[in-house]
Amino acid sequence: MPEKAVKPALIPVNTVIFVGFPLLALILVPLWGFYQGFSAAQWVWALVFLYLNGLSITGGYHRLWAHKAYEAHPALRWFFALWGAGALQNSILIWASDHRRHHRHVDDNEQDPYSAGRGLWFSHMGWMLRDYPSGENDFSNARDLERDPIVMWQHRHYVAVTTFMNLGLPLLLGLALGDVIGTLLLVGLLRLVVNHHVTFFINSLAHFWGSRPYTESNSARDNGFLAFLTYGEGYHNYHHIFQNDYRNGIRWWQWDPTKWMIRLCATLGLASNLVKVPDFRIQRALLDTQFARARRELEAKAGDETLRELLEREYQLFTESVNQWRALQSERYE
């Protein structure tokens, strides 16, 4: 019988953070809540910290540094660097480098650090628990970030910064609220665990659950419910084909608070050069995907060459019109 493949060794620190912390939260938060209770102020602050961490990951780590979707004032960059460190998802340099590799090699089980092809558990958090070769640091795709003084300051001092943001700041807040332990449990521990899994949903569920209106070349899906949970990151199929767009939700009614935050920052002079994909390119992607599906359906049926040729000819004529007009728009975009 062939020998069973040996799994890479567990990473102790990551195992404590991603397995131990949730278990502690599951046990300690309900116990403290039952015997001591949490104040309304503690719940409000937990939500504030959660959103500041989350938007710093989506608006800072992700759309600003990983994808260069816009430019930001130094004050905003420092804000993202500090509160992003509070999310305890590694430094900007490591996070953005991994994410760029994910986009370049999406669904490649050997090169995508959190490939959905290796299963829901692996893409959600399994990839961080063991020392997989696909997760090795390689900053050759992040030379621009290595020249960024704010990014490199945070990278060098990451342990100190994230410790202060996750322990020191909740401790000071707890002293101010008159309940140190309760604040550490709610604003510190539970907020951190929730923030982790909200982000992890994008790597996992957003590659398994939802629709693929813009491209079927990878596993990324659009999912409005996940967008609500993830500060607008749930329109993942769109994002994977137009990754440099500062928006994920392109329609006015789509929930994307990260987009709204970036736009507000632009109004305040804190952001500029927002990248917005032209509408005709979006329409072209939709048409390409619809045509590919229609062609597959024809081939799956009778294989009628006449129908297939007619479909291809009509598609070519229509796309030529799109290229000439370049302003085709059947829906309203922001």
Language-model features: locations:
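Non-catalytic, topology-defining segments of multipass membrane proteins
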Residues: 1-200, 246-334
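Generic hydrophobic/packing signal
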Residues: 56-58, 111, 204, 223, ...
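Catalytic glutamate of the conserved HExxH
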Residues: 63, 204, 208, 240
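Active-site-proximal inter-transmembrane loops
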Residues: 145-150, 209-235, 241
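C-terminal accessory segments of proteins
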Residues: 195-213
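Conserved active-site loop/cleft motifs that coordinate metal ions or position small ligands
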Residues: 237-239, 273-274
